[in-house]
């Protein structure tokens, strides 16, 4: 049996996500994938430039010294720190660490992740400056 009635289709505005703070935050966090894509492509381009010799590397460094690219890279850095901070706050919610029959609070886990990030960053910078 068929009917001629149309099913109700609720309207959806293109800016539906701007009405609630949770959705704005979620879309902003997920939007950080675009600067991450940019960073990945720049690193990939740099690896190929390094592989192709000094002239190619000099061209890559010249490419990166463009003021517009510096601005884009600063935005990418800010987006990366934001993305990292949100994931570090999310990580303790995904794991249950029990110490002496009590659940470990979120703060030590987040601080540990930031501490590990700082240590790894310092080690990488030290190796880069030594070599």
Curated annotation (Swiss-Prot):
SUPFAM superfamilies: Fumarate reductase respiratory complex transmembrane subunits (SSF81343). Signal peptide: none annotated. InterPro entries: Fumarate_red_C, SQR/QFR_C/D. Keywords: Cell inner membrane, Cell membrane, Membrane, Transmembrane, Transmembrane helix. Its main location: membrane. It is found in: Cell inner membrane. GO terms for molecular function: succinate dehydrogenase activity. It is a multi-pass membrane protein. GO terms for cellular component: fumarate reductase complex; plasma membrane. The chain crosses the membrane at residues 30-50, 58-78, 109-129. Belongs to the FrdC family. Two distinct, membrane-bound, FAD-containing enzymes are responsible for the catalysis of fumarate and succinate interconversion; fumarate reductase is used in anaerobic growth, and succinate dehydrogenase is used in aerobic growth. Anchors the catalytic components of the fumarate reductase complex to the cell inner membrane, binds quinones. Part of an enzyme complex containing four subunits: a flavoprotein (FrdA), an iron-sulfur protein (FrdB), and two hydrophobic anchor proteins (FrdC and FrdD). This is Fumarate reductase subunit C. It comes from Proteus vulgaris.
